[in-house]
Structure formats: C-alpha cells, structure tokens
Amino acid sequence: MKSIYKKGAALAAAALMTVAFAGCGGGDKSASKGPKDTLTVGITNFADSLEPTDNYFGWQVMRYGVGECLVHFDSKMNAEPWIAESWKVSDDKMSWTFKIKDIKFSNGTPVTGEAVKKSIERTFAKAPRAKAMFELDHITADGQNVTIYTKKPIATLPGMLGDPLFIIVDVDSDGKVDFAKQGPIGTGPYMVKSFSKAKCELDANPNYYAAVPFKHLVINTIDDPNTRAMALQKGEIDIAVNVAAGDLALFQDKNKFNISSISSIRDVLARMNVKEGKPLADKRVRQALLRSLDRETYAKVLLKDTFIAGGPMLPPSLDYDFDGLMKAYPDKYNAESAKKLLEEAGWKDSDGDGFVDKDGKNLELDFIFYSGRAELPLYAEATQSDAKKVGIKINLKNVDYNVLDGIGVRGEYDLLISNILTEQAGDPEVFVNQYWKTNVDGSNPQNGSGYSNPEYDALSDQLASEFDPAKRRDIIIKMEKIVQDDAATLIFGYPQTNMVSNKSVQNANIYPCDYYWVTKDITPAK
C-alpha cells in the first residue's frame, strides 16, 4: 500500500506544480473591463444527451440552468416551492395536489396544470426509473392545479418530484425541438443555443420569471480535475465545479477566489455482486474483502482529509445514528481476520502465486470504475493493492460513465464503484431501495447485484407508507443495520463537495444535493 500512497502523493504534487506554474499571473483574466455578460463554467460531464428522461441526464439539464422541478431543495435538503407555489396531501394520503405558479416556458408557452400533467406522464412513459421511485395511478389537471394519484400512500412524493428526472418540460414542443441534441424547453434562467458533450452554449431565457444575470452562458467539459483547476487559475473559466482535494490549496487567496465547500450527502460506494456463482455470493468472502481495506488511511492520506472513512450506508451529515452504526460496524480494517475468513471459506494459496484459489481457480474480482471523479481511480487502485495482501486478485476496468448504468443493471461486475447522492429526493428512501431492495422481474432494475433480504424488503414497504418522521428514521436505521450485517455493500467514504469561483462573479455556492450548479443567484461581481 505504501507504493500506492507514494504514487498518489507524487501525482498530486506534480499536478499542483503544473497548475501553479501554468497559473502564474492568472486568476483574473476573465474579469471584464466592461459589464460582464458571459459566465463560463468548467465541469465534469457524463451526458452526451440533454433528454432528461434518459439515464441521469436530467441532472445536467438542471445543472446547466435549463430545467426546474415542482420543488427545490434548500441547503438543509428541505423541499421548498419552485414551479409549484404550494402542495397538500389528501386525507386518505392517496393523492397530492400542487398549485402551479403563473410562469412560462422559455418559448413563451404558459406553464399550466395540464402542461405539468403532460410532463410527468411523459417521464413515466419514457423512464423506467420513475416507476421504481413510486407507483403512479393517474394525474388530473384543473387550471393551475395538478393532482397526482398514487397506488399507495407516498410520504415523500413532493421530494421525489424534486429529482431532476421530473424536470417540467413543454411536451408539445417535443418533436419540433430535439430534446437530446437541442435541449428541452424548460423554465430555467437559460436556454440551449448549441450542445455537444464537450461544450454547451446557452442564452438568457427572455421569458424567465426573474432577472437573468448573464446574457450568455458557456459550459465547458473539462473531465480531468487538474486541468479544470488549471483553467480556473488561468482565467479561462469563471467557475470550476468539484476541484480535486490536492488542488484546493491553489485557491486560498480570498482576494482572487471563493471556495464554496460543504460536507456532502454523497457516498462513494461499490456495489457487490452477490448472485449465485459469483465469488461475493459467500458472505465470508465479502467480509474478507471489506476487512482487507484500510479506509481510514485512504481518507487521511490519499484524499487529504477531504473524505470521512466509510462504514454505514448513510453519511454523517444526515441524522441516521451514524455514530451508533459505525460503532457496531462489523467489518472494520483487519487484514488478519480477512485471511482467516478466506481460509474458512475454502480459499487458500495452493500454488504460491500470492493469490488464494479454490478448485484450481484464483479468487478474482472484476472492479468497474470510471475516472470522471478524481477519487474513484484512487480508491480502485488502493483496493487492488490492499486486497492483494490477503490474496484477492482485483482486475480493474475503467469504463465510460455512459455505459456504467447498463453494467450495473445487467450485473456485469463483481464490484462497481460510483459517487452517489444518498438523499436525492430530500429523503434517503430512494437511495436505500435502489441497490438493495429485491429486484422482482425488473421491479427494481438498479439492483443488478442479486441482493435480497425479506426483512429488508418488509421494512422498505413499511417505509413507503409511513408519514411520521421519527418512525421513518427508525425504519431507515434498521435497514442500514441489515445491509452492514449482511456485508452487502462497500462504502469507501463520504466526500466534501465544492465549487470554486474567481472574483468576477459572486454567489457561486454548492448545494448538498449537487443538482444546482448554474442558478439565477450567480451574478457578476459588484
């Protein structure tokens, strides 16, 4: 493991020097001599389409300031009005009625209850993920009111409709406008002028319901985090989203830069394929892998204390008894225990090659990762190094983000790492279901791992119809305990997230949910 740490430190140091030299004299080149009318942002981008119902591409539509939902999440992940000005649940808890603000789409078409109805129905028709979030019965519209009827009580429906999957679009324009290539007709402050995965150019929405601070917006895809930091240093961009931990030191001068950083509600986790016939189907092998990994050192050394070491499913930034679950966590780092568990499971190094084997085959695990987030390759390489010490061979496979979802759904992995929101609907319910609730005939397609626990499923069903916050909290904690006792997932750590801006702009702040990058609140500096 020392070689991995030295390698990581050397790469970070080299990147820092490169950016520092490249940035000499930089940092203020984007400041305009006259009024600033163009905002330029550097991001990492996984979307080659702006169709919001495809994959998770709605996130980019919202991040670019094109789309909005019925509800918005504040800095505490409370749902607040956005396109909807208010909402209420029926007495029987089987429907929710939303009152829609008198606003317009970017093409000037009014946003009515009927328009919202069509948009949500379109999402359900095109996106399997919508059906996995809640069971829709039907929708009615009456003027500026829209009522959503569900097949069973859904306590968190307003929050679910804050997921970018449910961006409200002008369905009648679909076909006249190619949503994938030209972007949907939404209600955000900006509208797409041109789009490619590498670059998106946008103009101010003339029909927006509030002042739009910039006439033009340019989104540059800069997937390499060091290059993204360099671009900000040189003044080529005004804002960099998610600067790597090793580069944050470059932006400490408060006269030139502003760093918005928060403890996120994200996990970096690896799904574990436990299907019959897979090595990780044996709980002892899963436990051995978990105990072989020194996650505390990863957080402190590789990631320079910008992560907290993992254990429970939900991060410490959320109120779900993190300390209690971490204290009870059974699979903390213990390499000797890992070796004993492998031996108990019948895995021994019979040929002296350094890897344990059984029936003539080494214990090998395919680890799928993508490099769009700087920490993922580091975690993957650290896993490979530490697992080798107990005799587990890890085969690393770097893939494009666009194929990651399909790999996960099909279960074509042993380990699959991702950086994911745990409270994407203002509540962890979607997260605790998507990878661990039993997938019955495609009912939960994100669970391609084969994991199934009847007690967990029963709690999930109970959670879906429970409206009392205290009882919901207790149910979720019980679900977390089941997964960690089953050694059913690998939580590497809980990251901070950040947005760094130069002094030509103000109010560039990151939110916990990571949906809101470009907003109407980001304005030219006064």
Q: At which residue positions do the language-model features occur?
A:
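Ligand/substrate-recognition segments at binding pockets and active sites
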Residues: 348-423, 497
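Ligand-site clamp/hinge motif
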Residues: 205-250, 393-395, 400-401
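Aromatic- and charge-enriched surface segment that lines or borders ligand/interaction sites
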Residues: 85-126, 147, 279-281
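Structural transition elements
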Residues: 309-350, 371-377
